[in-house]
Amino acid sequence: MKRTILFSLLLALPLGLAAKSEFCCPSASKVETDVPWQEKTPTLRRQAELDKLLSNMVYVSGGTFTMGATSEQGSDAYDHEKPTHSVTLRSFYLCKYEVTQALWRAVMGNNPSYFKGDNLPVENVSWNDCQTFITRLNSLTGKKFRLPTEAEWEYAARGGNRTRGYKYSGNNGLSNVAWYEENNSSKTHPVGLKSSNELGLYDMSGNLWELCSDWIGTYSSSAQTNPIGPLSGSRRMMRGGCWLNDARDCRLSVRAHCAPDDRGYNLGLRLALSHL
């Protein structure tokens, strides 16, 4: 049985943040973890969601960038964001929005989210749940959707080769681009309501933590090309901060992690493709 747990990002963990109550999901009695959709997904409705997804994939031109606690992060940077290092990436595609509940339901036939709404980002999904979703999505589309690597995520959050060097994804004023502690109204918000970043990507800071493909790992100062993280591990990386975090933890270089079967109402995903 998959579990819904309370998870915290603890300072004692190699890449953890200071423990905070906002990193915890609600009690299991409040969370619907596998709710079947009573209506079968009509073919036209499902296809409309799949077509929308493909039209929302943003081309991210490859390039070289400095990953980690760069100068604009200042004293807010945590040790696990260091050292900075040069990373070169090939081009890829990233969805301009976090996966919505409408898309998840069209593919999976259920909606596990704590907060409900078709255009809200799906949450209360684990890394393992996301792999099942992606497998079914690829079967439906004939594509090879995946989670972004941690390096791809940060490069895109920084604006790729259009970067303006912001502290958050798309702006130095967090409220312009993110739902976070100061403006969350105690819930997630529909995708795409805030301003986008330089690449036209929305909600890369705040709203939900976004899962990456990498196992947890530490940085080195060595230059890397298309890094994928450690080959094995016990915890997966997630990036971007969420609706419950303060500004410090929504910066574009912040790193966090969770177990592959952890779920929470602050955890979701964004899809990547190597080729469209």
Predicted regions and their residues:
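GGW-centered surface loops in extracellular recognition modules
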Residues: 28-61, 66-67
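Cleaved targeting-peptide boundary
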Residues: 20-25
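Short, solvent-exposed loop/turn elements at domain surfaces
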Residues: 66-77, 101-103, 114, 245-249
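Surface-exposed recognition segments
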Residues: 73-87, 161-162, 184-187, 204-276
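Positively charged n-region of N-terminal signal peptides that target proteins for export
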Residues: 1-4
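Short aromatic-cysteine micro-motif
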Residues: 53, 77-161, 182-202, 275
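Hydrophobic h-region of N-terminal signal peptides that target proteins for export
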Residues: 10-17
